[in-house]
């Protein structure tokens, strides 16, 4: 559910107005949007992981990212966890898309696809695509769709990601998150 004006050109326009230099390309898992990204973005500078709109001389750069929704059962509980995925380039994003599709993901269904896979399985798929990728648990405190969510989450990152926890280098706390509350959870001390 996005605005009909959510196009790369508009994203660049409003980023310039707001003074934002680096933004997410968003939703690289959606096949039509991914095709659009491949046609209209070019890595600049080459090897940086930052992309510019081919048709623009703007300084605004895109990072290659998406968000997915994992809904699955683990330890006799239904889990609902949203994850942000950052890829170092479009080639890695294509490998992630293939890995998800090969495991039955219906990527064309939504910009943020609902996957019947565990958060841990997503980390595996992403790291198989490229070791430089990052998986970041999204809005970690929201009740229904977060790793620490009271209605469907876990009590720790370790409980969710098990032996792959060391690959979780950051969490997205969300705009409504209370920083002083975050600081109380020592598990987050070494995580961005």
Residue positions per predicted region:
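Short, acidic/polar
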Residues: 3-15, 153-161, 182
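Functional cores that coordinate and move charged inorganic groups
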Residues: 155-162, 171-192
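Extended substrate/RNA-proximal surfaces in nucleic-acid metabolism proteins
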Residues: 35-172
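Short secondary-structure capping/turn segments at boundaries of alpha-helices and beta-strands
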Residues: 10-12, 23, 66-72
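Short amphipathic alpha-helical segments and helix-helix/interface helices
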Residues: 12, 34, 38, 123-127, ...
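Flexible loop residues that form catalytic
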Residues: 28, 140, 176
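Divalent metal-dependent hydrolysis catalytic cores, especially in the metallo-beta-lactamase
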Residues: 12-33, 134-136
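Di-metal (Zn2+ and/or Mg2+/Mn2+) metal-binding site signature of metallo-dependent hydrolases
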Residues: 1-4, 29
């Amino acid at each position: 559910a996005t605005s009909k004006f959510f196009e790369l050109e508009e994203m660049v326009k409003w980023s310039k107005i707001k003074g934002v230099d680096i933004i997410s390309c968003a939703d690289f898992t959606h096949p039509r949007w991914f095709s659009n990204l491949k046609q209209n973005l070019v890595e600049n500078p080459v090897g940086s992981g930052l992309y510019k709109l081919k048709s623009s001389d703007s300084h605004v750069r895109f990072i290659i990212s998406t968000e997915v929704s994992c809904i699955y059962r683990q330890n006799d509980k239904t889990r609902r966890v949203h994850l942000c995925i950052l890829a170092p380039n479009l080639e890695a994003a294509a490998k992630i898309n293939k890995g998800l599709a090969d495991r039955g993901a219906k990527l064309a269904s939504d910009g943020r696809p609902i996957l019947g896979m565990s958060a841990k399985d997503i980390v595996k798929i992403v790291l198989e695509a490229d070791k430089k990728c990052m998986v970041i648990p999204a809005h970690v405190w929201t009740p229904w769709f977060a790793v620490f969510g009271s209605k469907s989450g876990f009590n720790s990152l370790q409980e969710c990601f098990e032996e792959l926890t060391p690959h979780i280098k950051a969490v997205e706390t969300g705009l409504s998150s209370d920083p002083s509350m975050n600081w109380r959870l020592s598990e987050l001390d070494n995580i961005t």
